[in-house]
Amino acid sequence: MAKKVKQALLNKKEQKLHRYLIAFPVIAFVIKLITMSNIQGGGWLGADGENYFKGVDGLYADGLFSKAEILNYWPAGYPILLWLLALISITKLVYLIGIIQSIFFAWATYYLTRNLSKTSLAWIAFPVSLFISFNPTLSLSTLAVGYEAPVAACFMMVLGIIVSNKKDQAEFQIKHAVFAGAWIALASFMQPRYLLAGLVIFLIWALTYASKKQGLILAMVALCTTLLSPAALIARNVVAIDQTSISTNLGVTMSIGAGDETKGGYNRTGPEVPCVPTPPSTSVTDNQKVVCVVKWYLTNPVKTLKLSIYKSVYFWSPWSGPLVEGTMARNPWLKIAPTQDLVKTQSGADLVNGPFGKMISWLWILGQVVFLFYGFYILRRIDPLSKLVANASLSAVVVSWLISIGTIGDHRFRLPTMSLSLLLQVSAFWNLKKKVTKAL
């Protein structure tokens, strides 16, 4: 009898949690719909919104194999997805972008947290759903024209699939590898740099299998599925411009973040890394720029270390304040952030940009990193599944961080993996909350 009562109470608790896991993303989605109805045009341009629309214009005029320069300078993936929506309605395109991205984000949040709720990590499902659904920067970015929030949703789907796959250790299903590979394929279709993060996650996942054969099969299936994305982008450029590339801006991006006098941000100072064209050519190709920058890093270890520190600070910098560095000036949060009104007065500007503001900004940067690694430490100690979640989450964040160090220091680059960094940070916060509550 006692067992039945205990089980009934447990079921009731699980049902209550499930309702919250549905309610948070749904309420956030409704808030976004209301927000869209009060925004001129139904949404916002992201940091590169105009350039994405230039790509859509080229595709809309000439089709998939448009020769528009923007489609080979930058990866064509995200503009292609927008173009498909434009074929439905060009006049309501921004509304369609906001609605589709918001639905996807809401579903991914639910899918991840619902799977977590069925494991030893059920205790973080509630706060993770709450903080991700209502994080003003990450969640509201679904209303902006940009790949960042959809990529964050893709990573949530991948982690949810991994959790679902490992819940039943006795069952090996190849479909999980296909699905996970497909989501990383979508993420890297929008921004190829996240292909590397996906591959690291697959490796970590595969190594958790006692059977090396099963682990190898899983990794290979996920990898092959993922590689369909860059293959498609390369094929498009081969047909369109007879060039086997995904994009031609990597060298430019790396050059901006390197040099003797610069600090690694977009506002570079001093001369660029010297790079001489290979004869008989008189111009430097993008690939040659990449090689020149890599050589500069290797031959200037002290300067490379200093730049790495600067870029790390920029990567974790606040969205506003005296230490801000990056391309998030169109961050939806800044439209309602209290500091934005505060700096309009001289006394407020002195407070925000003075010693007090700098202290708060440094505490914000250090706090993010400390909570990230503390959350990682907490989750790794629970059981093999939570260890896998911790390893997969941190690996994606660190890869994104390292890519920023290798290119440009920009706080926007942390947004696509912010769903995973929030999971670790919220785990740290919730664990501390439990300890304080228990102590009191």
Q: Each predicted region: which residue ranges?
A:
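Transmembrane-helix motifs of polytopic, lipid-linked glycan transferases
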Residues: L96-S120, A153, M157, I161, ...
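Specific aromatic-rich, kink-prone transmembrane helix
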Residues: Y111, P150-D168, F179-I184, I201-L203, ...
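Loop-to-helix entry region of an early transmembrane alpha helix in multi-pass inner-membrane enzymes
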Residues: N72, A76, I80, I88-W107, ...
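Short hydrophobic/aromatic helix or loop-helix immediately within or flanking a transmembrane segment
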Residues: D48-L59, E69-I90
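Membrane-interface alpha helices of multi-pass inner-membrane proteins
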Residues: S129, H176-Q191, I201-L203, T225-L228
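Multi-pass, polyprenyl lipid-linked donor-dependent membrane glycosyltransferases
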Residues: A47, Y73, L96-F104, L130-M157, ...
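Membrane-interface anchor segments at the N-terminal boundary of transmembrane helices
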Residues: K92-L96, K311-V397
